[in-house]
Amino acid sequence: YKAVSEDGLYASFAQVIERVGNTRLKVYLYHIPPVAQVPIGFGLIERLRRDFPQTVVGIKDSSGDAANTAELIRRFPELAVFPGAESYLLSALRQGAAGCISATANINAAGIAKLIASRDAPDADSLQQQIAQVRRIVQSYPMIPALKGMLAQALNDPRWRNIRPPLEALDEARMRKLQSELDAVGFRLVARPASAAA
């Protein structure tokens, strides 16, 4: 849907919450205006929090706008706010973000987790720079094919390269270029198959 009103969005969320009718339901909103073309605005969040405070408990902010994330944290301290990318994660953490929900966590979970755990450490700014470099490189390629290609290489499992159209897998030359760029910043994905992790 495009060009929907705040009232319409509110009614949509309220209807689902009321029909489920279970206090165990927890809703995490997803603000991704570049893709959805329907923002989750502050007014809508205020209304949902007012009427469903035990249900609407968090938001993933994929606006790519650090100022928007900061304002969400400031306005809604009781809401778990998650930036949708790690590009400005340290700043968001220091302002009160709950963590990060990022596509590149599929390949850089260790780096992101290390930053979250070390947000107050002397090397936190350096850790932020490292994870931001990895993010910049990976997002300069078609993101999902790049991530799946890297997982295929790391796990030695070509099934990870399977992509549904209209997306297309990266060819070997582009995968080598991606790996070379990541090598240049000291990043190497080390992954274990699920059976080895147990």
Regions inferred by a protein language model and the residue ranges of each:
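Short glycine/serine/threonine-biased micro-segments
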Residues: V56, F82, A97-C100
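A generic "binding-loop/recognition-motif" signal
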Residues: D65, A85-Y88
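Glycine/proline-rich, positively charged
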Residues: Y1-A80
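Structured C-terminal cap/extension of enzyme domains
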Residues: S87-A198
